[in-house]
């Protein structure tokens, strides 16, 4: 089967934003204008097409990123052929940053939505940082221009100041608030208006209003200057006073956007149907096709040192990244993949190169929100869902078994909060186990474990809302009613002293014995190393090299049990430098136990300390309640970092220990008569004060 759309006309994009910037409404309009959905879904009445989980519709926030395929030929059909958009809708709530992170990982470009009134909000910064991390080219869309207090150029200034990027507007707003009418197109130098009769489908172009002509000339000049910086040739032309053609300007802005040097900005009101078609035009004009970005990097499964890459080309060996697992009520498990190279037909065999397991692809579907279309094959650049994968987890690579590769893995954050869950009835025990297993497979930032001493099931995640929603899903999707314990902080531990410790495990009484012996130098890890920093300095084969991995494993396993109060050890440097072995009795198990015994002794010799998670907290409050809010944060052992005025109120930034923040949502509402809001995300681990250490060690007994 030949390719229906050339890869140069693919756009894999995400629509990302802060919670209330109007992202889901924007995605809805994208579907409406691209002709895929005939009734506009509104988040306000819980009917949006991409919010397909019941809780999302109730809470009005988007939790799972649905991948949707749509087509666009231009707002005025200015392109001869259609472009194929794969649009991923992502959550903006900070408890779901993992969802945003994994979507950005597989996108080629993003539309970042800001609210015209509140501008750059705390989580906009989080999302922006994630997009920087993966080098995603982006366009800024300032939405909600019809809202009270909306101001396009103020938001542009905020982006420059708070996000450190220089936005280049290619439009200006005509009017604002109730008087928002449309945009000035700085490329065509025309005013663009929208009709209610066709729900803002086709732009109506007119001359620029006289009172805005001067402003338009000024910003057109800024845009042309940004374009001229793309190359020496254009710069010389510009400096010599020659006019640049619109074609030259467009090509230059596209080049600089894809290189991540600039961010183009447009404006509109998705809810009032004023401007989304021009956002889609900008996606075609300025965001990259899969062939415009560097080849994906990876490594050889047999030797991580050997780096490899795959180009976006059908003739290269097949490779794809599983970026999301979802459980579907009708077909079971859906594995969403981004295909980077090659072709895959249904019925083909592939290998999961991370686990070394073979998989056979059953059916393949492309999603349109929660409707689906069966397809027979996928090619480089496609995003699709595979049905029938047995053992694939988010972030793993599927590839051609003869030419394996492991694509760059995703980083998943460590959970910071845990609660105990138990089923309400004995009969639900097994069902709960299955449900939690499925949820953990879908969401790598959610962990499940059994407490060996109490037998309780402990679930851990990124915040209270994260765990609430997972427990809620367990009830709805798997019919498991569960009781939830009080939230517990996930503490960590580290050592403060350097020490050398001998680990020796010897059993030699009749028959095959055991002999493992190693000397390990322990120290706090180097800056920036969070887990185990393992160094092998054994010389002369006093410990054969095949036993070194067992020593590392022994240390890693013992680190989980901590040295102060049973919490995992982090930031540990362990250097194995000496030891001995026995020709007959030594084996991997014996060295693993010896290393584990040495690590255990850190409790006496390592000067262990308890660490507590510190959260970056931002509270937005009317000025009247500022004193109360700050006083309360101080009482919670918070450190106030700063304050600033915004349209939405005073913004207080602080760092507060997570243990002091439980139930804060209710407290901050009652302090401010429901008018303050807050957001928080994990920042770092800090040494816990003595009274916390005392309480925690007592509790652990």
Curated annotation (Swiss-Prot):
Keywords: Cytoplasm, Elongation factor, GTP-binding, Nucleotide-binding, Protein biosynthesis
Cited PROSITE patterns: G_TR_1, G_TR_2
Residues annotated to bind GTP: 17-24, 89-93, 143-146
Keyword Transport: no
UniProt cross-references to SMART domains, sorted A to Z: EFG_C, EFG_IV
Gene3D superfamilies xrefs: 3.30.230.10, 3.30.70.240, Elongation Factor G (Translational Gtpase), domain 3 (3.30.70.870), P-loop containing nucleotide triphosphate hydrolases (3.40.50.300), Translation factors (2.40.30.10)
GO biological process: ribosome disassembly
Ranges for domain tr-type G: 8-291
Subcellular location: Cytoplasm
Gene Ontology CC: cytoplasm
InterPro entries, per database record: EFG_II, EFG_III, EFG_III/V, EFG_IV, EFG_V, EFG_V-like, EFTu-like_2, G_TR_CS
Molecular functions per Gene Ontology: GTP binding; GTPase activity; guanosine tetraphosphate binding; translation elongation factor activity
Family membership noted in the UniProt record: Belongs to the TRAFAC class translation factor GTPase superfamily. Classic translation factor GTPase family. EF-G/EF-2 subfamily.
PANTHER family tied to this protein: RIBOSOME-RELEASING FACTOR 2, MITOCHONDRIAL, TRANSLATION ELONGATION FACTOR G-RELATED
Role description: Catalyzes the GTP-dependent ribosomal translocation step during translation elongation. During this step, the ribosome changes from the pre-translocational (PRE) to the post-translocational (POST) state as the newly formed A-site-bound peptidyl-tRNA and P-site-bound deacylated tRNA move to the P and E sites, respectively. Catalyzes the coordinated movement of the two tRNA molecules, the mRNA and conformational changes in the ribosome.
UniProt protein name: Elongation factor G
Organism lineage string: Bacteria, Pseudomonadati, Pseudomonadota, Gammaproteobacteria, Pseudomonadales
Underlying gene: fusA
């Amino acid at each position: 089967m030949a390719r229906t759309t050339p890869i140069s006309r693919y756009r894999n994009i995400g629509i990302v934003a802060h919670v209330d910037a109007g992202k889901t409404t924007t995605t809805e309009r994208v579907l409406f204008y691209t002709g895929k959905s005939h009734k506009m879904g509104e988040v306000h009445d819980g009917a949006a097409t991409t919010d397909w989980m019941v809780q999302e519709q109730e809470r009005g926030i988007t939790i799972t990123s649905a991948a949707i395929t749509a087509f666009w030929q231009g707002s005025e059909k200015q392109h001869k052929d259609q472009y194929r958009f794969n649009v991923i809708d992502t959550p903006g709530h900070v408890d779901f940053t993992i969802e945003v992170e994994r979507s950005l990982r597989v996108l080629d470009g993003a539309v970042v939505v800001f609210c015209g009134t509140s501008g750059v909000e705390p989580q906009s910064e989080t999302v922006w940082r994630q997009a920087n991390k993966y080098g995603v080219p982006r366009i800024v869309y300032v939405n909600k221009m019809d809202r009270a207090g909306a101001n396009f150029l103020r938001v542009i200034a905020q982006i420059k100041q708070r996000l450190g990027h220089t936005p280049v507007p290619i439009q200006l707003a005509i009017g604002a608030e109730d008087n928002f009418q449309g945009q000035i197109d700085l490329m065509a130098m025309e005013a663009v208006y929208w009709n209610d009769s066709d729900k803002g489908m086709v732009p109506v172009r007119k001359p620029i209003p006289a009172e805005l002509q001067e402003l338009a000339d000024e910003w057109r000049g800024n845009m042309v200057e940004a374009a001229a910086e793309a190359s020496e040739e254009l710069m010389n032309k510009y400096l010599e006073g020659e006019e640049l053609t619109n074609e030259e300007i467009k090509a230059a802005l596209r080049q600089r956007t894809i290189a991540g040097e600039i961010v183009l900005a447009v404006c509109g009101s998705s809810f009032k149907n004023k401007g989304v078609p021009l956002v889609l035009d900008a996606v075609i004009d300025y965001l990259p096709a899969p062939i415009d970005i560097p080849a994906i990097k990876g490594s050889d499964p047999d030797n991580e040192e050997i780096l490899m890459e795959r180009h976006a080309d059908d003739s290269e060996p097949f490779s794809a990244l599983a970026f999301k697992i979802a459980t579907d009520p009708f077909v079971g498990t859906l594995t969403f993949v981004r295909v980077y190279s090659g072709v895959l037909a249904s019925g083909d065999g592939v290998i999961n190169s991370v686990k070394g397991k073979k998989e056979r692809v059953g059916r393949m579907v492309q999603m349109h929100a929660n409707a689906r279309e069966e397809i027979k094959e996928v090619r480089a650049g496609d995003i699709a869902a595979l049905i029938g994968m047995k053992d694939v987890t988010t972030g793993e690579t599927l590839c051609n078994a003869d030419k394996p590769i492991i694509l760059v893995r995703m980083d998943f954050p460590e959970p910071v909060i845990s609660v105990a869950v138990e089923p309400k009835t004995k009969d639900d025990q097994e069902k709960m186990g299955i449900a939690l297993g499925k949820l953990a497979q879908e969401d790598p930032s959610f962990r499940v474990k059994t407490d060996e001493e109490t037998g309780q099931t402990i679930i851990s995640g990124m915040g209270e809302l994260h765990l609430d929603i997972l427990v809620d899903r367990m009830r709805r999707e798997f019919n498991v009613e569960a009781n939830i314990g009080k939230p517990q902080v996930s503490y960590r531990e580290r050592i403060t002293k350097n020490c050398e410790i001998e680990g020796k495990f010897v059993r030699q009484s009749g028959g095959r014995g055991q002999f493992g012996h190693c000397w390990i130098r322990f120290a706090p890890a180097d800056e920036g190393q969070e887990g185990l920093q393992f160094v092998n300095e054994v010389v002369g084969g006093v410990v054969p090299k095949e036993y070194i991995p067992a020593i590392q494993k022994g240390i890693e396993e013992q680190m989980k049990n901590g040295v102060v109060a049973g919490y995992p050890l982090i930031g540990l440097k362990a250097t194995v430098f000496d030891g001995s072995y026995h020709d007959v009795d030594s084996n991997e198990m014996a060295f693993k136990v010896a290393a584990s015994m040495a690590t255990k002794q850190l409790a006496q010799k390592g000067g262990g300390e308890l660490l507590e998670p510190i959260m970056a907290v931002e509270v937005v409050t009317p000025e009247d309640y500022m004193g109360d809010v700050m006083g309360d944060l101080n009482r919670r052992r918070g450190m106030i970092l700063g304050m600033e005025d915004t349209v939405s109120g005073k913004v207080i930034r602080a760092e507060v220990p997570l243990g002091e923040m439980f139930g804060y949502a209710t407290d901050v509402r009652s302090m401010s008569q429901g008018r303050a809001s807050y957001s928080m995300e994990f920042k770092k681990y800090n040494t816990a004060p003595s009274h916390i250490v005392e309480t925690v060690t007592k509790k652990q007994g």
